[in-house]
């Protein structure tokens, strides 16, 4: 791919004494593995640009699995992520690295990713809504089609107060049992609309996306989730004094 295209670095690691091995997500080619020769040398002007969450324009060449980076320019400064939003950004980067095949085009997903990073950078509240919307978009692009609005058993529209159990590749079926794998009709409508007005619908969305993403991730845990658990401060619960 000799032409310029928009991209983000998902992950980088040292490669030889002066180079970097990059995992990048591009608009036209999807996920691509690149060697950035000399990027670690003192004279390189690429050091600051080849960082996660920095919008890039880049060119590369090569026919094998690992391509060679020819040029890269930062379109702007890195989007400002810190604390909980930084860990959230690292999570979606790792998610893409785990589930996307190399060199499969996902142009619409690229903009879903950009929108998610921008939402994380601009949020003053919880990052959870942005993460859930991105996960649902990713599942859709992977071909994971789900009908949230109709019961797969009866064909009728879901009812807010009824409970439904999800069966993989079949849909949601009415259930009299309530457990961690069931959802109310209200939850399903929130998932369809990608709108999560309260903690209850957010938790339901998280349960569903974890369930749906599990086959793509296999048994290997995400490192970013473990980092989040280790380094983010625990929330303290304030109690009223008598």
Swiss-Prot record:
It holds the Pfam family RecO_N. Keywords: DNA damage, DNA recombination, DNA repair. It comes from the Bacteria. InterPro entries: ARFGAP/RecO, DNA_rep/recomb_RecO_N, NA-bd_OB-fold, RecO, RecO_C. The keyword DNA damage applies. The keyword Flavoprotein does not apply. One of its GO terms (cellular component) is bacterial nucleoid. One of its GO terms (biological process) is DNA recombination. Involved in DNA repair and RecF pathway recombination. Belongs to the RecO family. Monomer. NCBIfam families: reco. This is DNA repair protein RecO. The lineage of its organism: Bacteria, Pseudomonadati, Pseudomonadota, Gammaproteobacteria, Enterobacterales. The gene is recO.
């Amino acid at each position: 791919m000799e032409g310029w295209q928009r991209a983000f670095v998902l992950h980088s690691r040292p490669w030889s004494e002066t180079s970097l091995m990059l995992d990048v997500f591009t608009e036209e080619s999807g996920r691509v593995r690149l060697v950035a020769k000399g990027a670690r040398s003192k004279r390189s002007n690429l050091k600051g640009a080849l960082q996660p969450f920095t919008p890039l324009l880049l060119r590369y060449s090569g026919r094998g699995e690992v391509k060679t980076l020819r040029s890269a320019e930062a379109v702007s400064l890195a989007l400002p992520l810190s604390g909980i939003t930084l860990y959230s950004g690292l999570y979606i980067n790792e998610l893409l690295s785990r589930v996307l095949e190399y060199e499969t085009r996902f142009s619409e997903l690229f903009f879903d990713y950009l929108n998610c990073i921008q939402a994380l950078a601009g949020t003053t509240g919880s990052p959870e809504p942005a993460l859930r919307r991105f996960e649902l978009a990713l599942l859709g692009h992977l071909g994971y089609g789900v009908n949230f609005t109709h019961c797969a058993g009866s064909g009728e529209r879901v009812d807010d107060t009824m409970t439904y159990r999800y069966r993989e590749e079949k849909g949601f079926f009415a259930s009299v049992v309530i457990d961690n794998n069931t959802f109310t009709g209200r939850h399903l409508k929130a998932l369809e609309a990608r709108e999560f007005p309260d903690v209850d619908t957010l938790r339901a969305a998280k349960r569903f996306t974890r369930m749906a993403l599990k086959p793509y991730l296999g048994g290997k845990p995400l490192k970013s989730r473990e980092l989040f658990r280790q380094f983010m401060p625990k929330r303290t619960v304030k109690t009223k004094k008598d």
